[in-house]
Amino acid sequence: FTTIHNYVDVNTMILRKGAVSAKKDERLLIPMNMRDGSLICTGLGNEDWNCSAPHGAGRLMSRKDAFDSFTLSAFEKSMEGIFTTSVARDTIDECPMVYKPMEEIMNNIKETVIVEKIIKPIYNFKASENAGGKKRGKE
């Protein structure tokens, strides 16, 4: 299955910005963060939600605030148990603490999807725009 976000559904004329289709019995993926993984869900077709669901956990803060708020060591600690080569100063803006908690998201989406499975990462990779370049964030 595929999960597309930020588009116009020409069949229903619904604009989904930051959302994905969650029609009745439709399978979809909602990513949480690089530590907690993703939710595999089945849509409920809730018209009050425009048959939609969020396309991800949602950020708690801006990228700049993330660089100002978290240290590389805190990021490293949060990723213990998951193999990754992506924990670096220039990816602090993607650390798990920057996103809303999975439990909160799962509670908030009960009216639009059924969470079938939580898939946890064993390996995580994030490309870095600034690899080898400007260093941002705190040590």
Where are these regions (language model features)?
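Domain-length cofactor-binding catalytic modules of enzymes
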Residues: 1-139
